[in-house]
Amino acid sequence: MTYIVSLFLLGLVLGLVAVASNPAPYFAALGLVVAAGVGCGVLVGYGGSFLSLVLFLIYLGGMLVVFAYSAALAAEPFPESWGDRSVLGYVVVYTVGVMLVAGWFWSGWYETSWVVVDEFKEFSVLRGDTSGVALMYSYGGGMLIVCAWVLLLTLFVVLELTRGLSRGALRAV
């Protein structure tokens, strides 16, 4: 299980490097999907199965709509891919930077951070992430509604910002 979690962590770092190094919205959105997927895998490895499911469904269901609109409105005829020279330079710089930072902090966190949830499953009586579901829907119901409204407002703000010189998605007919 430790090898799978470390593979997910490597995929998370590569996905974030793909997001940070690419100026084209198509490939950056693909990097975000990869980073979200393997990030949810890391959460599952550390025992947050419900949290990772909620994160994955909300992220892919809600935020990819915004990415689809942004990519459609900022369409380029020849987008820069990961094989282009400028983007490849950023990929190399970010990867070397991550390796240097990991090498700098290697001895401090390596011994204690690789404990996954399967190694202590004999000691766990309840699931910590599922016990918060009732609180989220009872006491946190108002905040859940506020978050839904904020996501809707974010969608309209992104549509308004990416409309360019045209009249936008909301226009009088």
From Swiss-Prot:
The chain crosses the membrane at residues 1-21, 27-47, 53-73, 86-106, 139-159. Its EC number is 7.1.1.2. InterPro entries: ComplexI_Subunit6, NADH_UbQ/plastoQ_OxRdtase_su6, Nuo/plastoQ_OxRdtase_6_NuoJ. It is a multi-pass membrane protein. It is an enzyme of class 7 (translocase). This is NADH-ubiquinone oxidoreductase chain 6. It catalyses: a ubiquinone + NADH + 5 H(+)(in) = a ubiquinol + NAD(+) + 4 H(+)(out). GO terms for cellular component: mitochondrial membrane. It holds the Pfam family Oxidored_q3. It comes from Salmo salar (Atlantic salmon). It is found in: Mitochondrion membrane. It comes from the Eukaryota. GO terms for molecular function: NADH dehydrogenase (ubiquinone) activity. Core subunit of the mitochondrial membrane respiratory chain NADH dehydrogenase (Complex I) that is believed to belong to the minimal assembly required for catalysis. Complex I functions in the transfer of electrons from NADH to the respiratory chain. The immediate electron acceptor for the enzyme is believed to be ubiquinone. The lineage of its organism: Eukaryota, Metazoa, Chordata, Craniata, Vertebrata. Keywords: Electron transport, Membrane, Mitochondrion, NAD, Respiratory chain, Translocase, Transmembrane, Transmembrane helix, Transport, Ubiquinone. Belongs to the complex I subunit 6 family.
